[in-house]
Regions:
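Non-catalytic linker/capping segments at the edges of enzyme domains
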Residues: 1-101
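Flexible, active-site-adjacent loop/turn segments at secondary-structure boundaries
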Residues: 74, 106, 138, 152
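Active-site helix/loop of acyl-thioester processing domains in fatty-acid/polyketide metabolism
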Residues: 93, 97, 115-138
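Generic structural motif
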Residues: 93-95, 105-107, 151, 167
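Short histidine-centered catalytic/ligand-binding loop motif
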Residues: 104-118
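Short, structured beta-strand/loop micro-motifs enriched in basic residues and often containing a Trp
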Residues: 139-143
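Hydrophobic beta-sheet segments that form the core/acyl-binding groove
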Residues: 146-168
Length: 168
């Protein structure tokens, strides 16, 4: 799906191709809509460290610096199960910091040649969430304020960092 999403958003296609894609997608959607509905929580509970957190066991992940943090498999930023995932990876930088890295595709453009601001906010939120997961904590964003200092480029490697400033 990700490959198709990127191909459709990044290529000029004739109307006949779009009509063909629409027809095939409707046929597949009708077939898949008849299937069993998926539960994100049930799927997340198949991952031992996620099941532990959702069961109230807040244990830090046993990761070395540079190892990947598995956050949310359905995450728009990095989830392997999300059909439009940006495809970022989250890694441990230290016991109190994490990094999100990747290349953001033109599918996520705001202004020409720039990453949409809401995508930047999403990635910042997800990197902070991955850091909490790594530290064995569960938290939800109550407030997120961003002062954008400049545009983020599309199609180039980007790095987002999160660190613990204070814990209540």
């Amino acid at each position: 799906m990700r490959r198709l999403n990127r191909a459709l958003s990044g290529r000029r296609l004739p109307d006949t191709a779009l009509e063909e894609i629409t027809e095939v997608v409707h046929i597949l959607a009708d077939r898949f809509d008849a299937g069993t509905e998926r539960s994100k929580l049930d799927d997340m509970m198949t991952r031992p460290h996620l099941a532990a957190i959702y069961s109230g066991q807040y244990t830090p992940l046993d990761l070395e610096v540079g190892e990947e943090i598995e956050f949310d498999p359905f995450s728009l930023a990095a989830g392997e199960f999300h059909p439009a995932s940006i495809g970022l990876t989250f890694t441990k930088e230290s016991d109190d910091s994490g990094v999100g890295k990747g290349t953001i595709d033109p599918m996520f453009a705001g202004p020409p040649e720039r990453v949409h601001g809401v995508i930047q906010a999403l990635v910042i939120d997800e990197v902070m969430g991955a850091l909490n997961r790594m530290r064995g904590r569960q938290a939800y964003t109550a407030y997120l304020h961003i002062d954008y200092r400049g545009p983020a480029p599309l199609g180039e490697a980007v790095v987002f960092r999160a660190w613990v400033h204070e814990t209540d």
